[in-house]
A protein has these predicted regions:
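Short, flexible coil/linker segments at or flanking structured domains
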Residues: 7-9, 94-98, 134, 156-159, ...
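Aromatic-lined carbohydrate-binding/catalytic grooves of carbohydrate-active enzymes
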Residues: 146-228
């Protein structure tokens, strides 16, 4: 947290929190969310990596570096440290501390004896976040999801059949069902297929009705640009 009196209406433009190791360790990095991870060394890092970043200290010690409780604050990425073997934080944009409530996200270091334990310890990240503020959560129904990629009526129904046969709760329509996701002119209140992704046709109301008859839920993705 920032002292409100000392940092009144300030803007944070940079951060260089360092995480240093005693030697040049093996690490696994990706440069984007949902990207593929690749193996490299701390000394060979290039550009900014997304978090979490995993570092192998030795055969019995693995470290994951990341952040939690990210609210109204710039996302942290990790780049090669300016000194020693390690990484340091870099912000993806400026931070208005008044908007952020004079609070920063957690920067965490998770340690485990093997990589699988890092995944098992994911409750650690959950507990660093504020408790749920939604009083009635009965409408939230977690479940497995499969993405529909053809953006056609026929392909969607086939995907729904597969989901129903394999007890998959949801079918997801990702980018492209209402136009090009990065185009601010794309209207998420319409079904307008992005021609770069599919030739269609996609009758989404008909697909949703069919999914309901099969007991399968439908999720639709909307880029934040269409919500502004």
């Amino acid at each position: 947290a920032f002292d409100k009196l000392d940092f009144w209406n300030r803007t944070v433009t940079d951060e260089k929190t360092q995480f240093l190791f005693q030697k040049d360790c093996k690490t696994w990095v990706t440069d984007m969310a949902q990207g593929a991870y690749f193996e490299t060394k701390l000394s060979a890092l290039k550009g900014a990596a997304d978090r979490p970043q995993v570092i192998r200290v030795n055969d019995n010690r693995f470290v994951a570096i990341g952040e939690a409780a990210l609210v109204d604050y710039s996302r942290m990425k990790l780049e090669k440290s300016e000194t020693g073997f390690g990484v340091q934080s870099v912000l993806s944009g400026k931070v208005n501390l008044d908007l952020a409530g004079y609070r920063s996200p957690w920067r965490y270091v998770m340690v485990a004896g093997h990589p699988g334990k890092l995944v098992e310890n994911n409750y650690f990240v959950l507990n660093l976040n504020e408790p749920n503020q939604i009083a009635n959560t009965s409408w939230i129904k977690p479940g497995q999801v499969i993405r529909e990629v053809t953006l056609t009526t026929a392909g969607s129904m086939a995907c729904i059949d597969f989901a129903a046969e394999n007890n998959i709760a949801y079918v997801l329509f990702d980018a492209g069902w209402y136009g090009a996701e990065e185009d601010i002119k794309s209207d998420a209140t319409t079904v307008t297929i992005d021609p770069a992704r599919s030739k269609g046709p996609l009758d989404l109301p008909k697909v949703i009705e069919y999914a309901d008859s099969k007991g399968v839920g439908i999720l639709v993705y909307v880029n934040k640009k269409a919500l502004h």
